[in-house]
Amino acid sequence: NIGNPLLLEKNIKPKTIFVIEASSYQIEYSKYFKTDFAIILNISPNHLERHRTFKNYIKSKFGLIKSQKKNSFAFIEKNNNFLKEELKKNKTNSKIIKVNLKISNKIKKKIKNSYFENKNNLNNLKFVLEISKKLKLKNQKVFKVVNSFKELNFRQQILYKNKKLLIINDSKSTNFSSSLNLLESYKNI
Protein backbone atom coordinates (compact mmCIF):
# COMPACT_ATOMS: atom_id res chain seq x y z
CA ASN A 1 0.00 0.00 0.00
CA ILE A 2 2.97 2.31 0.42
CA GLY A 3 6.44 2.32 -1.06
CA ASN A 4 7.46 0.92 -4.42
CA PRO A 5 5.68 -1.99 -6.13
CA LEU A 6 7.80 -5.10 -5.58
CA LEU A 7 7.63 -6.17 -9.23
CA LEU A 8 9.21 -2.88 -10.31
CA GLU A 9 12.34 -3.35 -8.18
CA LYS A 10 15.35 -3.79 -10.46
CA ASN A 11 18.44 -3.96 -8.27
CA ILE A 12 17.59 -6.70 -5.82
CA LYS A 13 20.61 -7.91 -3.88
CA PRO A 14 20.68 -11.34 -2.16
CA LYS A 15 20.39 -9.89 1.37
CA THR A 16 17.61 -7.45 0.51
CA ILE A 17 14.72 -7.53 2.97
CA PHE A 18 11.24 -6.78 1.68
CA VAL A 19 8.31 -5.88 3.89
CA ILE A 20 5.13 -6.86 2.10
CA GLU A 21 1.61 -6.17 3.28
CA ALA A 22 -0.60 -8.89 1.82
CA SER A 23 -4.37 -8.99 2.15
CA SER A 24 -6.39 -12.14 2.73
CA TYR A 25 -7.36 -11.95 -0.97
CA GLN A 26 -3.71 -11.97 -2.07
CA ILE A 27 -2.74 -14.74 0.33
CA GLU A 28 -5.61 -16.90 -0.89
CA TYR A 29 -4.33 -16.80 -4.48
CA SER A 30 -0.60 -16.80 -3.77
CA LYS A 31 0.24 -20.47 -4.04
CA TYR A 32 3.98 -19.85 -4.48
CA PHE A 33 4.39 -16.93 -2.08
CA LYS A 34 6.68 -18.14 0.69
CA THR A 35 8.14 -15.95 3.40
CA ASP A 36 10.97 -16.32 5.88
CA PHE A 37 9.03 -14.22 8.37
CA ALA A 38 5.26 -13.87 8.54
CA ILE A 39 3.01 -11.86 10.80
CA ILE A 40 -0.75 -12.16 10.95
CA LEU A 41 -2.29 -8.95 12.23
CA ASN A 42 -5.76 -7.53 12.65
CA ILE A 43 -7.97 -10.58 12.89
CA SER A 44 -11.50 -9.21 12.74
CA PRO A 45 -14.56 -10.06 10.65
CA ASN A 46 -13.33 -8.35 7.47
CA HIS A 47 -14.04 -9.06 3.81
CA LEU A 48 -16.90 -11.43 4.60
CA GLU A 49 -18.49 -10.45 1.29
CA ARG A 50 -15.59 -12.38 -0.26
CA HIS A 51 -14.88 -15.13 2.28
CA ARG A 52 -18.53 -15.64 3.33
CA THR A 53 -17.64 -16.72 6.90
CA PHE A 54 -15.22 -15.55 9.55
CA LYS A 55 -13.81 -19.08 9.63
CA ASN A 56 -12.97 -18.88 5.90
CA TYR A 57 -11.38 -15.47 6.43
CA ILE A 58 -9.09 -16.84 9.16
CA LYS A 59 -8.24 -19.85 7.00
CA SER A 60 -7.25 -17.51 4.18
CA LYS A 61 -5.01 -15.38 6.43
CA PHE A 62 -3.50 -18.54 7.96
CA GLY A 63 -2.45 -19.61 4.45
CA LEU A 64 0.50 -17.24 4.89
CA ILE A 65 1.87 -19.50 7.63
CA LYS A 66 0.91 -22.78 5.96
CA SER A 67 2.95 -21.89 2.88
CA GLN A 68 6.15 -21.18 4.79
CA LYS A 69 9.29 -23.29 4.39
CA LYS A 70 11.22 -25.00 7.16
CA ASN A 71 13.28 -22.66 9.34
CA SER A 72 10.80 -19.84 8.74
CA PHE A 73 9.23 -17.85 11.55
CA ALA A 74 5.56 -17.02 12.01
CA PHE A 75 4.55 -14.39 14.54
CA ILE A 76 1.07 -14.38 16.01
CA GLU A 77 -0.53 -12.60 18.92
CA LYS A 78 -0.14 -14.74 22.03
CA ASN A 79 -3.77 -14.34 23.09
CA ASN A 80 -5.41 -14.75 19.69
CA ASN A 81 -7.67 -17.76 20.17
CA PHE A 82 -8.68 -17.91 16.49
CA LEU A 83 -5.08 -18.42 15.36
CA LYS A 84 -4.30 -20.80 18.23
CA GLU A 85 -7.25 -22.92 17.10
CA GLU A 86 -6.02 -22.84 13.50
CA LEU A 87 -2.56 -23.96 14.69
CA LYS A 88 -4.11 -27.00 16.36
CA LYS A 89 -5.81 -27.99 13.09
CA ASN A 90 -2.88 -27.43 10.72
CA LYS A 91 0.65 -28.73 10.46
CA THR A 92 3.14 -25.95 9.79
CA ASN A 93 6.80 -25.90 8.79
CA SER A 94 7.59 -22.66 10.52
CA LYS A 95 8.56 -21.93 14.09
CA ILE A 96 5.62 -20.18 15.73
CA ILE A 97 6.47 -17.17 17.89
CA LYS A 98 3.62 -16.08 20.15
CA VAL A 99 3.97 -12.36 20.78
CA ASN A 100 2.85 -10.75 24.02
CA LEU A 101 1.50 -7.32 23.09
CA LYS A 102 2.30 -5.78 26.46
CA ILE A 103 4.79 -2.96 25.95
CA SER A 104 7.27 -2.42 28.76
CA ASN A 105 7.97 1.04 30.18
CA LYS A 106 11.54 0.66 28.95
CA ILE A 107 10.30 0.38 25.36
CA LYS A 108 7.72 3.15 25.81
CA LYS A 109 10.50 5.53 26.86
CA LYS A 110 12.32 4.89 23.58
CA ILE A 111 9.28 5.83 21.49
CA LYS A 112 9.41 9.52 20.60
CA ASN A 113 6.72 9.48 17.95
CA SER A 114 3.01 10.34 18.35
CA TYR A 115 2.26 7.82 15.59
CA PHE A 116 2.51 5.16 18.30
CA GLU A 117 -0.09 6.72 20.59
CA ASN A 118 -2.48 4.58 18.58
CA LYS A 119 -2.86 1.14 20.20
CA ASN A 120 -2.87 -0.72 16.86
CA ASN A 121 0.35 0.94 15.73
CA LEU A 122 1.91 0.12 19.09
CA ASN A 123 0.84 -3.53 18.69
CA ASN A 124 2.38 -3.61 15.22
CA LEU A 125 5.59 -2.18 16.68
CA LYS A 126 5.76 -5.05 19.16
CA PHE A 127 5.81 -7.50 16.23
CA VAL A 128 8.52 -5.45 14.50
CA LEU A 129 10.65 -5.60 17.64
CA GLU A 130 10.26 -9.39 17.81
CA ILE A 131 11.33 -9.81 14.17
CA SER A 132 14.20 -7.39 14.75
CA LYS A 133 15.50 -9.71 17.47
CA LYS A 134 15.48 -12.66 15.06
CA LEU A 135 17.33 -10.56 12.47
CA LYS A 136 19.79 -9.47 15.18
CA LEU A 137 19.11 -5.79 14.51
CA LYS A 138 20.19 -3.36 17.20
CA ASN A 139 17.32 -1.74 19.10
CA GLN A 140 19.02 1.63 18.76
CA LYS A 141 18.78 1.43 14.96
CA VAL A 142 15.22 0.11 15.04
CA PHE A 143 14.03 2.98 17.25
CA LYS A 144 15.84 5.52 15.11
CA VAL A 145 13.77 4.34 12.15
CA VAL A 146 10.56 3.93 14.17
CA ASN A 147 10.83 7.45 15.54
CA SER A 148 11.12 8.82 12.01
CA PHE A 149 7.79 7.33 10.84
CA LYS A 150 5.25 9.76 9.48
CA GLU A 151 1.51 9.27 9.46
CA LEU A 152 0.06 8.31 6.11
CA ASN A 153 -2.52 10.57 4.55
CA PHE A 154 -6.06 9.31 5.09
CA ARG A 155 -4.95 6.45 7.37
CA GLN A 156 -5.41 7.32 11.02
CA GLN A 157 -4.02 10.75 10.16
CA ILE A 158 -4.20 13.15 13.10
CA LEU A 159 -5.35 16.45 11.64
CA TYR A 160 -5.78 18.36 14.89
CA LYS A 161 -5.17 17.67 18.55
CA ASN A 162 -5.52 19.65 21.76
CA LYS A 163 -6.63 18.81 25.31
CA LYS A 164 -10.32 18.73 24.39
CA LEU A 165 -10.45 17.71 20.76
CA LEU A 166 -8.86 15.12 18.49
CA ILE A 167 -9.66 15.10 14.76
CA ILE A 168 -8.57 12.03 12.81
CA ASN A 169 -8.89 11.43 9.08
CA ASP A 170 -9.33 7.69 8.63
CA SER A 171 -11.05 7.73 5.26
CA LYS A 172 -8.73 4.91 4.09
CA SER A 173 -10.61 2.50 6.38
CA THR A 174 -12.56 0.11 4.23
CA ASN A 175 -14.99 -1.22 6.81
CA PHE A 176 -16.63 -0.68 10.18
CA SER A 177 -14.28 -3.08 11.98
CA SER A 178 -11.24 -1.10 10.88
CA SER A 179 -12.77 2.18 12.06
CA LEU A 180 -13.82 0.60 15.35
CA ASN A 181 -10.24 -0.60 15.97
CA LEU A 182 -9.05 2.96 15.53
CA LEU A 183 -11.62 4.38 17.94
CA GLU A 184 -10.87 1.72 20.55
CA SER A 185 -7.21 2.64 20.49
CA TYR A 186 -7.86 6.11 21.92
CA LYS A 187 -8.97 7.05 25.43
CA ASN A 188 -12.04 9.13 26.23
CA ILE A 189 -13.88 8.63 22.96
Show which residues each predicted segment covers:
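Flexible active-site lid/hinge loop adjacent to a nucleotide/diphosphate
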Residues: 2, 6-7, 12-98, 103-117
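Nucleotide phosphate-binding/pyrophosphate-handling subdomain across enzymes
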Residues: 114-189
